């Protein structure tokens, strides 16, 4: 009994010492293992020491005379296990956790426990063969993975996001891990019961890696250096070898490290550049290019820079162009967003004749990212420097890539037409359209010629053929019509706006106006995103500028008033941010606002825009002010509040000097025109230098002079009509230097619009004014009172509708004499604008009580 006592509990026993030596030897062999493994070793060592203490010193101090205590001590002796047995127990526990996770389909736990299982079996195989329970576990786990894949493809069971992520990670690791145990797994699957009952276990030979001392680590790189240059050295002094067989493995490591901290992106880029040199097959080059371009874009997301570095952008553009060249020369390799990823890094996929290999990736996304990065850099570069001009020249490279990408995705869509492929074509066509719609025809012609010359001669596009590249209008029309036919939503609306902008830019006012009206974008533009609303504002402004160049002053002022009348032209056109003192804009909103700003070369000249708006307002406001001086009922009518406010401010000045800017020049010209001196007004307006920025400035100035003559005539007639009985047309012709035919046409138009109470005497070639048509003072006051009453009534109705939240029917009464109809009773009343009832009664307006008493009420109704 005493020998057994000392054998089981003594700290100096052979068994205990051998266990201790085994643990210490294990710890020495695994000095450079992971922290998690070392912590597990420490836990095991501490557990053994605790068990030794319990079975050693404490037992030795107990009373040996007690038989019951001796029996308990003997039972405790049987619990003591060696390190190998403990590791096997841990292995079994881990396998049980995996089996439980398989029952509930918890792939996150399976992935974690599988990694732990491999670490545990690595320790066991260092001193013995591979456990059969491990072979059974990994073989069953691989079968379970295959079953899950089959269920996924058949659609019987779908995994959620977290399960799918864990499943993909576990599937790759299991497949890669089981290659090392292929023979044992095959034996297990042939006869599972015989394999588990047999006693022989095959041991996988493990060659211990020789320890490398610090001196050897220092000398190893030197030994790897050739006479020609340097060699890349990895961990442990090993020289990294880049071979065609290792390309996919290197790419796998780079992809898995994406998004992690402390990752050297530049080193990864250099690695992939070396992989390109050793790549032999098209598949290898395509895979490397896809990863390389994505890594270059990641440099911007991980740095503090606002935009991508110019050298990296150009490198990414060259890689993208090379990728397209490889794809064009190898039509059996297709980059497609929905393709499945190739998981076997040991070998490459083989393509049978007539088959197509689909590689996961997106050509259109790369083109869009290049476009976005170029735009972002142009936003942050000072536009008044040579750097901006140099950077803008890169747009030619980008446009060439867009045309090339369009031709590539067109070919894919023609082979097999699907919604994702059609969407890719729409996106790249939209990007191309956004690069040409705002440019003059001459610039587009030069850009198209240079693009097609740089592309391979066999490359062509079915949407915009190479042969028709010289016709700019046909180019824009073809791109827009394609998007009208095959796209919808935002892309279709943006294509419509781009076409309208292009037509207005090239002086086709009526076509652009009709397209804008027929598209109904004015009614639902608020439902689109902010970028589309900005494009809508730009298009609206361009239509107004086109109307002004065509001499359509009223149309120009009416179109520009919505944008220019608000005083927020910069913000509405995305050409600058207005910082207000008490602004409640958050930093995130301000950042988004800055991202929406357009590059400088796409800007519309705001000073020219303001000058055109004020000039158009002057031509309408000055005759109107002269007309209202003798017509009190029209005093409340204002066409442009902005122009009126500027004119009033200028008139309040005691001393007015010569005009110093464009705005002062227009206001001074308006004062001369109101005073009847049209020659000085024309001279002052034509002296503004900003007209030289418009195409054909001489034609514009001639049009302005003619408009001043006509509006000067109208102003003169409005001002002095009460003092004339008749006026000779010949006198007016000499006064305003207009032909008598032109003057007769202007006066006839004024008479037909009831602006002038007169008649043309064609016999005497004169104007005969009618007297007594002006309103008396009492009549003017009655009209003013009626106008105010109507405005008050409308304001009350609007307030009532807001408070009742549109419940207009609750306040309508029966139209019968003295009858009160309940809700739902038959009534003949109509809404505002409906047909009148017999006797002159009109339907009640919804939402309020009808005003219907007295002579004043009758006057208002009339």
From Swiss-Prot:
Q: Where is the composition biased (Basic and acidic residues)?
A: 55-65
For molecular function, the Gene Ontology terms on record are: RNA binding; translation initiation factor activity; translation initiation factor binding
GO process terms (BP): formation of cytoplasmic translation initiation complex; translational initiation
Q: Which UniProt keywords apply?
A: Cytoplasm, Initiation factor, Protein biosynthesis
Q: Where is the composition biased (Acidic residues)?
A: 17-54, 66-75
The superkingdom of the source organism is: Eukaryota
Pfam family example for this protein? Answer: eIF-3c_N
* Keyword Cytoplasm attributed: yes
Could you tell me where the Gly residues compositional bias lies?
Answer: 818-862
The Gene Ontology CC terms held by the record are: cytoplasmic stress granule; eukaryotic 43S preinitiation complex; eukaryotic 48S preinitiation complex; eukaryotic translation initiation factor 3 complex; eukaryotic translation initiation factor 3 complex, eIF3e; eukaryotic translation initiation factor 3 complex, eIF3m; multi-eIF complex
Q: Could you tell me which residue ranges the PCI domain spans?
A: 600-774
Q: Which residues form a coiled coil?
A: none
Q: Does the keyword Calcium apply?
A: no
What is its subcellular localisation? Answer: Cytoplasm
| Region feature Disordered, mapped onto this chain | 1-81, 813-862
What is the protein's major site of localization? cytoplasm
SUPFAM superfamilies registered for this protein in UniProt: Winged helix' DNA-binding domain
What does the record give as the function of this protein? Component of the eukaryotic translation initiation factor 3 (eIF-3) complex, which is involved in protein synthesis of a specialized repertoire of mRNAs and, together with other initiation factors, stimulates binding of mRNA and methionyl-tRNAi to the 40S ribosome. The eIF-3 complex specifically targets and initiates translation of a subset of mRNAs involved in cell proliferation.
Known partners and oligomeric status = Component of the eukaryotic translation initiation factor 3 (eIF-3) complex.
Give the family from UniProt.
Belongs to the eIF-3 subunit C family.
* Protein name, as recorded: Eukaryotic translation initiation factor 3 subunit C
């Amino acid at each position: 009994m005493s020998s057994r006592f000392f054998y089981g509990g003594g700290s100096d026993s052979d068994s205990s010492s051998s266990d201790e030596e085994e643990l210490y030897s294990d710890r020495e062999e695994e000095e450079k293992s992971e922290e998690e493994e070392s912590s597990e070793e420490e836990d095991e060592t501490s557990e053994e020491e605790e068990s030794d203490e319990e079975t050693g010193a404490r037992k030795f101090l107990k009373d040996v005379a007690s038989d019951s205590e001796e029996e308990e001590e003997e039972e405790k002796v049987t619990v003591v296990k060696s390190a190998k047995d403990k590791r096997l127990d841990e292995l079994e526990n881990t396998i049980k956790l995996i089996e439980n996770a398989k029952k509930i389909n918890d792939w996150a736990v399976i992935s974690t426990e599988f990694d732990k299982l491999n670490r545990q079996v690595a320790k066991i195989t260092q001193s013995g063969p591979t456990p059969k329970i491990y072979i059974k576990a990994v073989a069953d786990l691989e079968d379970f993975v295959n079953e899950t894949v089959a269920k996924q493809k058949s659609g019987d069971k779908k995994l959620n996001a977290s399960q799918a992520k864990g499943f993909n990670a576990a599937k790759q690791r299991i497949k890669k891990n089981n290659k090392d145990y292929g023979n044992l797994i095959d034996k297990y699957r042939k006869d599972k019961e015989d394999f588990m009952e047999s006693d022989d276990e095959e041991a996988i030979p493990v060659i211990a890696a020789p320890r490398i001392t610090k001196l050897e680590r220092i000398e190893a790189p030197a030994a790897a250096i050739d006479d020609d240059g340097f060699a890349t050295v990895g961990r442990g002094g090993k020289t990294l070898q880049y071979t065609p067989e290792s390309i996919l493995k290197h790419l796998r490591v780079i992809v898995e490290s994406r998004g992690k901290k402390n990752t050297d992106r530049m080193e990864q880029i250099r690695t992939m550049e070396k992989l390109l040199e050793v790549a032999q097959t098209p598949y290898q080059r395509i895979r490397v290019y896809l990863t390389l371009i994505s890594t270059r874009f990641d440099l911007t997301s991980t740095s503090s820079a606002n935009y991508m570095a110019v050298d990296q952008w150009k490198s990414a553009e060259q890689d993208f162009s090379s990728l397209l060249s490889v794809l064009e020369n190898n039509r059996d390799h297709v980059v497609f967003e929905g393709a499945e990823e190739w998981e076997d890094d040991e070998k490459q996929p083989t393509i049978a004749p007539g088959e197509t290999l689909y590689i996961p990736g997106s050509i259109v996304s790369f083109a869009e990212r290049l476009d976005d990065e170029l735009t972002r850099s142009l936003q942050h570069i000072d536009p008044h420097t040579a750097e901006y001009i140099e950077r803008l020249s890169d747009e030619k490279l980008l446009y060439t890539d867009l045309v090339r990408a369009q031709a590539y995705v067109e070919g894919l869509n023609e082979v097999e037409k699907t919604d994702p492929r059609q969407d890719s074509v729409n996106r790249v066509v939209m990007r191309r359209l956004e690069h040409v719609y705002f440019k003059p025809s001459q610039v587009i012609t030069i850009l198209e010629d240079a693009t097609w010359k740089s592309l391979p001669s066999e490359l062509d596009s079915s949407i915009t053929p190479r042969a028709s590249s010289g016709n700019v209008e046909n180019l824009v029309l073809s791109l827009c019509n394609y998007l009208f036919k095959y796209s919808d939503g935002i892309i279709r609306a943006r294509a419509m706006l781009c076409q309208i902008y292009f037509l207005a830019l090239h002086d086709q006012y009526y076509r652009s106006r009709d397209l804008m009206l027929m598209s109904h974008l004015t009614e639902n533009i608020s439902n689109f995103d902010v970028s589309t609303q900005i494009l809508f504002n730009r298009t609206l402004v361009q239509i107004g500028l086109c109307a002004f160049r065509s001499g359509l002053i009223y149309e120009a002022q009416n179109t520009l008033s919505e944008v220019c009348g608000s005083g927020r032209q910069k913000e509405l056109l995305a050409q600058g941010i207005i910082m207000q003192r008490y602004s409640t804009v958050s930093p995130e909103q301000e950042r988004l606002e800055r991202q929406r700003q357009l590059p400088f070369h796409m800007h519309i000249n705001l000073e020219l825009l303001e000058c055109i708006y004020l000039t158009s307002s002057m031509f309408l406001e000055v005759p109107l002010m002269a007309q209202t001086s003798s017509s009190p009922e029209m005093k409340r009518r204002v066409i442009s509040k902005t122009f009126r406010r500027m004119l009033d401010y200028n008139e309040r000045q005691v001393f007015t000097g010569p005009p110093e800017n464009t705005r002062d020049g227009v206001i001074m010209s308006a004062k001369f025109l109101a005073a009847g001196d049209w020659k000085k007004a024309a001279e002052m307006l034509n002296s503004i230098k900003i007209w030289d920025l418009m195409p054909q400035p001489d034609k514009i100035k001639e049009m302005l002079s003619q408009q001043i003559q006509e509006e000067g005539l109208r102003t003169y007639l409005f001002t002095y009509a009460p003092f004339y009985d008749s006026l000779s047309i010949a006198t007016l012709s000499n006064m305003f230097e207009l032909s008598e035919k032109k003057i007769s046409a202007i006066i006839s138009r004024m008479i037909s619009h009831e602006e002038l109470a007169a008649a043309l005497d064609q016999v005497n070639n004169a104007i005969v004014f009618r007297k007594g048509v002006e309103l008396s003072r009492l009549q003017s006051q009655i009209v003013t009172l009626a106008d105010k009453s109507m405005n008050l009534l409308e304001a009350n109705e609007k307030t009532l509708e807001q408070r009742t939240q549109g419940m207009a029917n609750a306040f309508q009464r029966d139209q019968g004499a003295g009858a009160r109809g309940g809700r739902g009773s038959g009534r003949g009343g109509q809404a505002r604008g409906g047909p009148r009832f017999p006797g002159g009664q009109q339907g009640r307006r919804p939402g309020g009580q009808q005003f219907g008493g007295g002579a004043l009420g009758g006057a208002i109704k009339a």
